[in-house]
Amino acid sequence: IVSMTTERSSEISSPYAAQPAATSAAAPAPASASKPFDLDAVKKVRTVHLAQAKAAGQKFSMLTCYDALTAQIFDRAGIEMLLVGDSAANVVLGYESTLTITLDEMIPLVAAVSRGASRAMVVADLPFGSYEQSPQQAVASAVRLMKEGGAHAVKIEADASMTEWVRALVRTGIPVVAHVGFTPQSEHALGGFRVQGRGDASERVREDAVALAEAGAFCVLMEMVTTQTAQLVDDAVGAVPTIGIGASNVTTGQVLVWQDMMGLREGRVPRFVKQFAQIGKVMEDAARAYREQVRSGEFPAAEHTFE
């Protein structure tokens, strides 16, 4: 798999290794075993570290992110991957559909996150309309996301028919996350937001994932698939790490839209979302308190003014 390196073991024996001297002195102690891989010890997360995490049985986390300050917060929290997703269409720009956002709108968001993140890997979505026409279009769009936006990798919604797109990106030196299962950019073709991989469809998702991994994707993201399908895919792609969103806990990593998992948005959230906080309520209460203190003259007080 492209972007993954294989380290030669330091313990390989050599035919020229010195033999112990025939003396009464004690033989030197054998070299200690190599230290187990620890993702938390990695100073800058790269594709190889995610593969090592899967091999070591360690899970990693990904959150969406769209600005520098939030990137800094998530970086301090140890989140390994930040996804500048086309979900920005909904949660940042106020569009009804992710299909609306353009590449030109995505790039400034990617650049902001890249400036804020120091440890996490920044992955940028290829938005609808920026890659479908040809592998060449995909490469041109991805180059902009990396060159102008500072992304470390791109995510592409694809199936087995798009292996040449992935190969073209990888040949250009662009790490690829392949998105299979439910692909939001194809919501109309899929008949809406529906769980994928039920029954015989499970094999199709597996075939898509394997084909894209073999084409060079360093990671496979599965969205809204059954637990059985997620396990099937995770096993089938071997050493390639997997990320799930609504794909059970069998994957190597998990991803959520941060506004959903922190309770920033009102209304129903998808079944696969767990809300770890209610930031929206905190912000609303703070804004209301500010407004009331401005009206009453309590703010600004003496300690907030200059003589």
Whereabouts are the PLM-identified features?
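Short, Lys/Arg-enriched N-terminal segments with co-localized hydrophobic residues
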Residues: 1-3
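Alpha/beta enzyme core
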Residues: 5-56, 60-307
